[in-house]
Regions:
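Compact, glycine-rich, soluble single-domain proteins
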Residues: 1-128
């Protein structure tokens, strides 16, 4: 569903993690992630399916990251790892075991939504 507006909802906590999530539909958009952007809005995120490690080189701002496991039949995914406020330029996650993708988020998004490891999240159309 690349290009379609999405939101990331924490079904365990009943919270919205990010209301405007873009899906990286190509290798290049996953490779670039949020590099080169001057900032990220508080309600924004980037879903990168298939990505299990990230780096912060060339990033201009810190981010939160939620690493998600495989999609269940109902479309939900378990949170397998979290990184809060990864600093620009120096943060790195080599591998998040069990991850099948990662969502890059504005710093503080995970705390605001009370998201924890083991929670179930769903990417769904933003119009819901």
């Amino acid at each position: 569903m690349p290009g379609a507006p999405l939101r990331l909802r924490n079904t365990t906590r009943g919270t919205i993690v990010a209301g405007r999530v873009t899906s990286a539909g190509t290798f290049w958009t996953s490779f670039m992630g949020l590099m080169g952007r001057p900032s990220i809005d508080l309600d924004e995120g980037l879903w990168m399916p298939g990505v299990t490690n990230i780096h912060m080189f060339f990033m201009r701002f810190p981010i939160d990251c939620a690493f998600l496991g495989p999609e269940s039949p109902d479309g939900q995914r378990d949170v397998v790892a979290l990184r809060h406020r990864m600093p620009a330029w120096i943060g790195i996650v080599w591998r998040a075991p069990g991850a099948r993708g990662v969502v890059e988020l504005a710093p503080g998004a995970l705390e605001r939504s009370a998201t924890q490891i083991g929670d179930r999240l769903i990417l769904e159309p933003a119009t819901r």
